Curated annotation (Swiss-Prot):
5-phospho-alpha-D-ribose 1-diphosphate binds at residues 78, 103, 130-138, 199. This is Uracil phosphoribosyltransferase. Binds 1 Mg(2+) ion per subunit. The magnesium is bound as Mg-PRPP. It catalyses: UMP + diphosphate = 5-phospho-alpha-D-ribose 1-diphosphate + uracil. Belongs to the UPRTase family. Its cofactor is Mg(2+). Catalyzes the conversion of uracil and 5-phospho-alpha-D-ribose 1-diphosphate (PRPP) to UMP and diphosphate. Uracil binds at residues 193, 198-200. GO terms for biological process: UMP salvage; uracil salvage. It comes from Bordetella parapertussis (strain 12822 / ATCC BAA-587 / NCTC 13253).
Length: 213
């Protein structure tokens, strides 16, 4: 299945706290990173391993090491930055690519305004991070950009997803795996996820929310 709703008890508990409207910026930011780390654990379970040897305290020890493609983490600005450290806490050697995608609040259409991608993308697994998968426009635009640059293995990590956004991504890119902490009810008339988390970018950075979900 290309869509994975991770219903681990720790994720369910932390996400429940994040839904509180009165949660502090500090707590929301920390929980975003914690849930991102748990999603990363799930999204990398099938990474290939190769045997290796190390010198232990009692002599040579046979161990496993991660093999295969290197990883690039791709936060979609700006809200994706809030998940970045959570992913890097588990994969500290990963390179970071940055994609800027903005959504027109009237048309709900996404457009890219920034592209800072690492090299050798054809040899990397890309983990795109964005807290909210709403209409799917931003995610599709980011995937389009990565594929144009040569990346062929892409996974998306989101805190909350709407069915409409999932459908949009899989229609455009059926080869992409989606890992999300929750599939919510759907979008309201303004294109916001219900019940959602509110504006994740505003809640992570402490700026004023223009709309509430």
């Amino acid at each position: 299945m290309p869509v994975h709703e991770i219903r681990h008890p720790l994720i369910r508990h932390k996400l429940g706290i994040m839904r509180r409207a009165d949660l502090s910026t500090k707590s929301f930011r920390e929980l975003s990173q914690e849930v991102a780390a748990l999603l990363t654990y799930e999204a990398t379970k099938d990474m290939p391993l190769a045997p290796a040897s190390v010198e232990g305290w009692c002599g040579t020890v046979e161990v496993d090491k991660i093999a295969g493609k290197k990883v690039t983490v791709v936060p979609i600005l700006r809200a994706g930055i809030g998940m970045l450290d959570g992913v890097l806490s588990l994969i500290p050697g990963a390179k970071v690519s940055v994609v800027g995608v903005a959504r027109n609040e009237e048309t709900l259409q996404a457009h890219t305004y920034l592209e800072r991608l690492v090299g050798e993308l054809d040899q990397r697994l890309a983990l795109i991070v964005d807290p909210m998968l709403a209409t799917g426009g931003s995610m599709v635009a980011a995937i389009d950009m990565l594929k144009r640059a040569g990346c062929r293995e892409i996974r998306a990590l989101t805190l909350v997803s709407a069915p409409e956004g999932i459908d949009a991504v899989l229609t455009a890119h059926p080869d992409v795996q989606i890992y999300t902490a929750s599939i919510d009810q759907g979008l309201n008339e303004n294109g916001y996820i219900m019940p959602g988390l509110g504006d994740a970018g505003d809640r992570i950075f402490g700026t004023t929310q223009k709309h509430a979900e």
